[in-house]
Regions:
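Residue-level signal for the short linker/turn that defines the boundary of a DNA-recognition helix
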Residues: 148-149, 199-200, 211
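Single conserved hydrophobic/aromatic residue that forms the stacking wall/gate
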Residues: 2-13
C-alpha cells in the first residue's frame, strides 16, 4: 500500500522498498517515474533498495501480482539480480508465453478473466523447487523471525561458505542477503509504527535490531527519504510485508514453511 498526495500536477505515490517483486499490467495510463519518464506498460519490478515518486496524471487501472520473496524465480528465466532496482519491460524479456499473456490481458476487459489467464500461466510454469530454494527460504524465515542476525550465521545455517551463500541468495531473491535484511528491518519499523505511532524511539530501536536511534533514523531515511517523525507527520505507516490484514502476509507464510 503506497501513500499518495496531490500536488496539482497529478497524484503522487511514494514508492519504497517492499522486500518483494511485482508483475504489473497497466490497463489504464502508465505511471510517471519522477524525473525518469513513464513506467513500461507491462513490466516486472525487481527488488528495490531506493525510494522514489510515481506520478499519475490519468486513469489508473492495473493488475499487479506481488510475489513472496522467492516467488518470482520459478516463473521467470533470468537471474533475479538482473532485475535489481529496475522496471523491466515484458517485451524486453523475449518470453513468448509471457508476451502472449500480456496481449491477452490488454485485450480483455473482464478482470476475473484476466486473473484466470494469469493463474493458468503460472500453473503451467510450476516446477519442483531445488535444494538452494529451500536453503534461501529458510534464511528468509530466520531474517523475519530474528530482528538482528548476521549474514555469516545465515550462511552457516545453510551449510554454505559466505561467498557461495551470498551468490545463491542474490540469484534467488534479487538482492544481497545483507541488503535484504535491511529492507525487512525497514518494513518491521513501518509495521511497529503502524500499530503504535507513539512508540518510543528507544523501544523501536531495540525491537528492530538497530544499534542506536541514529542508526535507525539513517536507515529509515535511506529507504523512505525522511525521518520516522517526518514520515508520521505526512502519511500513515503501513507494512505490506508484516501486516496481518495484507493478503501478501509474508510472515505467516514463512511461519508455515
Amino acid at each position: 500500500r503506497d501513500s499518495s498526495t496531490s500536488r496539482g500536477l497529478g497524484d503522487v505515490y511514494k514508492r519504497q522498498p517492499s522486500g518483494c517483486m511485482h508483475l504489473v499490467f497497466h490497463r489504464g495510463d502508465s505511471l510517471n517515474i519522477h524525473a525518469k519518464g513513464l513506467q513500461p506498460k507491462n513490466f516486472i519490478r525487481g527488488q528495490f533498495s531506493i525510494y522514489g515518486n510515481l506520478i499519475s496524471k490519468g486513469n489508473i487501472d492495473m493488475i499487479a501480482i506481488i510475489f513472496h520473496p522467492l516467488g518470482l524465480k520459478p516463473f521467470i528465466q533470468c537471474p533475479m539480480s538482473d532485475l535489481y532496482n529496475r522496471y523491466i519491460d515484458i517485451e524486453d524479456l523475449e518470453d513468448i508465453e509471457l508476451n502472449h499473456l500480456k496481449n491477452s490481458i490488454s485485450s480483455e476487459r473482464n478482470v476475473q478473466t484476466c486473473i484466470q489467464f494469469i493463474e493458468l500461466f503460472l500453473m503451467k510454469r510450476l516446477v519442483d523447487i531445488d535444494y538452494n530454494h529451500k536453503r534461501v527460504q529458510n534464511s528468509i524465515s530466520q531474517i523475519i523471525k530474528q530482528p538482528q542476525i548476521e549474514v555469516n550465521t545465515l550462511a552457516e545455517s545453510a551449510c554454505l561458505g559466505y561467498r557461495q551463500f551470498k551468490r545463491i541468495f542474490t540469484n534467488h531473491v534479487g538482492m544481497s542477503p545483507k541488503e535484504y535484511y535491511r529492507v525487512v528491518r525497514f518494513q518491521r519499523v513501518l509495521y511497529l509504527l503502524q500499530n503504535n505511532p507513539k512508540i518510543e524511539i528507544a523501544d523501536l530501536t531495540y525491537s528492530c535490531g538497530f544499534y542506536d536511534p541514529s542508526h535507525l533514523v539513517k536507515d529509515f531515511r535511506e529507504f523512505s527519504g525522511c525521518s520516522p517523525t517526518q514520515y508520521l507527520s505526512s502519511r500513515s505507516p503501513y507494512s505490506t510485508f508484516f501486516s496481518e490484514d495484507c493478503r501478501l502476509n509474508v510472515i505467516k507464510s514463512h511461519s508455515r514453511a
